[in-house]
Curated annotation (Swiss-Prot):
Pathway: Cofactor biosynthesis; biotin biosynthesis; biotin from 7,8-diaminononanoate: step 1/2. Its cofactor is Mg(2+). It comes from Xylella fastidiosa (strain M12). It holds the Pfam family AAA_26. Keywords: ATP-binding, Biotin biosynthesis, Cytoplasm, Ligase, Magnesium, Metal-binding, Nucleotide-binding. This is ATP-dependent dethiobiotin synthetase BioD. Belongs to the dethiobiotin synthetase family. Mg(2+) binds at residues 18, 56, 117. Catalyzes a mechanistically unusual reaction, the ATP-dependent insertion of CO2 between the N7 and N8 nitrogen atoms of 7,8-diaminopelargonic acid (DAPA, also called 7,8-diammoniononanoate) to form a ureido ring. The lineage of its organism: Bacteria, Pseudomonadati, Pseudomonadota, Gammaproteobacteria, Lysobacterales. NCBIfam families: bioD.
Length: 226
């Protein structure tokens, strides 16, 4: 895989972007690459003696090698577990592109690949003037879409893909992640998604119970190099 960085987004919130990002980090490391994660903006943080910390950002840090400083991985750690724009207003924090770009540049200098995880679904804004598309353009990286397999996934996947492309960005692949283990016709839905989405398919993850080490699933994903 020749990419030096990419942005992981999803069809919605709670569809496994962090877990998929961690799997991708382990996959890259297994290929001998130095791979680090980044969560530019995270809402829903717990205060500790080292400051505000976000569970997803900590998972990315644990899956990274080398292990970057937390503040590089997650420049904006917002306390409230709500939409980032609201969380930033409540925390009286102004999310700006410059600190995000600076952290990304430092991470890129430390690793062969940087896996940047977004917030919520693709259209979730970071603030009143910065969308995720704005950030991705500033970082000059392509996008990977995580599709949560549950009822309605066809609509969400097609809309998300169309939105990314309408924003003038490259969507270089998609990953199916089973959210609802009781979803009817999973294989049929997966087959239709593979027919309808005009981007490369990187693999399918079954429903994963809590506590599974993402490293054990690294061989299930097969990025089609860029």
């Amino acid at each position: 895989m020749s990419l030096s960085a990419f942005y992981v987004t999803g069809t919605d919130t709670g569809i496994g972007k962090t877990f998929v990002s961690c799997i991708l980090l382990h996959m890259l490391r297994g290929r001998g690459q130095r791979a680090v994660g980044m969560k530019p903006v995270a809402s829903g943080c717990t205060y500790s003696d080292t400051g505000w910390r976000n569970e997803d950002a900590l998972a990315l840090q644990a899956a990274s090698d080398p292990t970057p400083a937390y503040d590089l991985i997650n420049p904006y750690a917002l306390p409230a577990a709500v939409a980032p724009e609201i969380a930033a207003i409540e925390a009286r924090v102004t999310v700006a592109l410059e600190p995000l770009s600076a952290s990304f540049t430092q991470l890129r200098a430390q690793a062969d690949v940087v896996v940047v995880e977004g917030v919520g679904g693709w259209a979730t804004p970071l603030n009143a003037t910065i969308d995720q598309a704005t950030l991705v353009r500033a970082l000059e990286i392509p996008v990977v879409l995580v599709v949560g397999l549950r009822l309605g996934c066809m609509n969400h996947a097609r809309l998300s893909t169309a939105a990314i492309m309408a924003d003038g960005l490259r969507c270089i692949g998609w990953i199916a992640n089973t959210i609802d283990p009781h979803m009817a016709r999973i294989e049929e839905n997966l087959a239709l998604l593979r027919q309808r989405l005009p981007i490369p398919y990187w693999g399918h993850l079954p429903h994963i119970p809590p506590g599974i080490n993402p490293a054990t699933l690294a061989t299930r994903l097969h990025p089609q190099g860029d």
